[in-house]
Amino acid sequence: MTPEQILDIAPKVLTQTQRESYFNEGYLLLERVIDDHWLTRLRAATDELVERSRAITVSDVIFDLEPNHSAHKPRLRRVSNPVEHHAAYWDYCLHSVMPDIVSDLVGPNLKFHHSKLNFKWANGGEEVKWHYDISFWPHTNYSPLTIGTYLYDCGMEQGPLGVLPKSHLIDPMLSQYDADGHWTGCLSAADCARLDLAKAVFLPGPAGSLTIHNCRTLHYSARNDSDLGRPLLLNTLTSADAMPYTVNPIKPKHDQFMVRGERARFAHHDPRPCLIPPDWSKGYSSIFALQQEEEVQAVAR
């Protein structure tokens, strides 16, 4: 569906002004939307996963660990596919207000793509450099969005999500390959220098707040040097008529599950081109490993 078609449908949760702002600016921040019932469940589930990580010494398909992670002092960067590792996360995707909010932005027919739980651990949780999401998992259109849920209060000291307003309108999109054709998962220093990053907007918020950014919106988060962690639950959802061009790198079992509405009979193709990532059909590490150059070499094109 096009933005115009979506805006013609009466919203379930958002105001029309909020919807128009999302399409114009590429992001939204909604404060204190998720109630204590869901926060309590999600926090308990997250605590259980952190406890499980104590037995892990090397990053695997579930746990992406910081280099100094230990059983005594866990330090996680990410849990991949949390919806597959605790029922609370999947229940949240299906039964909370969150998917109704997303349907106000992508249309009534809504598909799940993937989820992740990013931690930004206290006293050194790593920076995430400026990047687009859609280049990791290109689709036939640009309806996909990522909606983040702050499980605890997040101030500027914890490295909240930062977005560049209207960057979803930049055409053509900037590359996430380097000059030698290797995938880096982020913009080059030269491209960053050409952007007016002084216009970046950061999205701190109290527990239960939602960050929403379009798949073309450039975003970033700073290192967390505070004494408080910043767990952020991220879910990526798409309109039913957005079809993936490539394999889902995280390979979730719920990929393409209809969260709301009905399956599309026709794909919607945006005329703008979309960068294609490397072939991840045999596996994928994480954006953290790529951007921190932990691989022997970035994935070749």
Model-predicted segments: where are they?
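Short, surface-exposed loop/helix-turn segments at secondary-structure junctions
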Residues: 61-63, 132, 181, 185-197, ...
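Generic beta-strand structural signal
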Residues: 108-115, 126-128, 143-149, 159, ...
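A short beta-loop-beta micro-motif enriched in histidine and acidic residues
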Residues: 132-144, 198-199, 205, 228-229
